[in-house]
């Protein structure tokens, strides 16, 4: 597999590289290239990732820093909150971290979101880098500068835009990924194709056997394309004033389900269910054919994404969508599909339309 590097750049605003590698050997070189050496470093990770990769990363970083400490919190979405951020602040203060310090987010989406938010707010903003170790984090959450934590069980309700200084992906970490976490990442990958790349969506569906076997060549191609799409959107619309909202396809219903299931389902699994609801609503409006709707269902099913959820009430799901942070002037900014690989923002979705789509994914 050819190792690769992409650049995320917006003139006069930000620029940073995305490295796609097979190990951690070049992490130090990447940090040096960005001029981030000789700083105090805090590695932020969780209880799942720390036993796997913390020592390898810390050992590598000792080449460029004589002051390294760590903050390890209990893994899980339930700990992506302000209480954990406060504990991070305490650790940074106790270790006399100053504005020249560097946070290293080592882990999945929860670690990246929380670390980024901590970096954006500590001393009014310090540098951080993303070292994502899950498929979802590599293809989605580590790129783009969205940071945040959950509040009162509302997903990412408190957050800030704060771009990382670099993103370093060691794709061999996916070999240790539990099947459920792999499935979670595939929800975001299928979403990416449905938004703007029909050919990519069909590539992912067609090559499911090789991708599910974690073929590094296939994974590299798939992850790179997702990063290219995400980087392009972020460069054009970094703060979600327009086009970037398309990346929320499947997320309105998905976030509602995630909250009501008390985060028992992983984010990408809920996005998968949300994709089915969005596809159904699009079909009901005549934007998707019945065949395209079934193709989307089949693609999700092939990667073991849930097509429905149980023990929920349609009215409760609808009410939860009303508290979504993507509301604008009392209207939901719902993302619909106009065929596979084409999407648009719609503010005219009625409660009855949404209820019909929600009922489609409830059992």
Give, region by region, the residue ranges found by the protein language model.
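A glycine/threonine-rich phosphate-anchoring loop and its flanking beta-alpha core
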Residues: 11, 117-210
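Active-site segments that bind and position negatively charged phosphate/pyrophosphate groups
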Residues: 202, 207-315
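C-terminal charged capping/lid subdomain of soluble metabolic enzymes
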Residues: 2-6, 187-189, 287-363
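Non-catalytic interfacial helical region
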Residues: 89-106, 115-130
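ATP/NTP phosphate-donor binding region
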Residues: 1-102
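Solvent-exposed alpha-helices and their adjacent loops that cap or buttress functional pockets
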Residues: 96-98, 121-122, 150-151, 158-162, ...
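Short glycine/serine/threonine-rich phosphate/pyrophosphate-binding segments
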Residues: 110-117, 138-139, 256
């Amino acid at each position: 597999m050819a190792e690769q590097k992409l650049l995320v750049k917006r003139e006069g605003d930000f620029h940073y590289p995305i490295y796609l590698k097979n190990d951690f050997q070049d992490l130090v070189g990447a940090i040096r290239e960005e001029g981030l050496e000789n700083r105090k470093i805090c590695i932020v990770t969780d209880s799942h990732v720390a036993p796997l990769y913390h020592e390898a990363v810390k050992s590598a970083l000792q080449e460029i820093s004589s002051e390294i400490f760590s903050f390890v919190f209990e893994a899980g979405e339930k700990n992506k909150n302000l209480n954990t951020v406060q504990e991070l602040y305490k650790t940074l203060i106790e270790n006399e971290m100053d504005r020249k310090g560097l946070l290293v987010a080592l882990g999945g989406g929860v670690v990246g979101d929380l670390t980024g938010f901590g970096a954006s707010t500590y001393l009014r903003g310090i540098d951080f880098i993303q070292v994502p170790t899950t498929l979802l984090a590599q293809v989605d959450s580590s790129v783009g500068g969205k940071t945040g934590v959950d509040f009162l069980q509302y997903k990412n309700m408190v957050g800030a835009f704060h771009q990382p200084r670099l993103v370093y992906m060691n794709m061999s970490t996916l070999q240790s990924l539990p099947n459920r976490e792999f499935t979670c990442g595939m929800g975001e990958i299928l979403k990416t194709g449905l938004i703007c790349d029909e050919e990519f969506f069909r590539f992912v569906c067609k090559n499911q056997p090789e991708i599910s076997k974690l073929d590094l060549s296939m994974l590299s191609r798939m992850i790179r394309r997702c990063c290219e799409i995400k980087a392009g959107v972020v460069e054009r619309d970094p703060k979600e004033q327009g086009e970037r909202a398309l990346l929320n396809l499947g997320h309105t219903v998905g976030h509602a389900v995630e909250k009501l299931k008390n985060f028992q389902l992983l984010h990408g699994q809920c996005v998968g269910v949300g994709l089915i609801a969005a596809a159904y609503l699009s079909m009901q409006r005549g934007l998707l054919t019945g065949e395209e709707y079934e193709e989307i269902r089949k693609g999700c099913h092939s990667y073991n994404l849930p097509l429905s959820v149980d023990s929920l009430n349609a009215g409760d799901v609808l009410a939860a969508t009303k508290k979504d942070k993507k509301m604008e002037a009392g209207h939901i900014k719902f993302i619909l599909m106009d065929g596979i690989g084409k999407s648009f923002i719609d503010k005219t979705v009625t409660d009855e339309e949404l209820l019909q789509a929600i009922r489609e994914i409830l059992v």
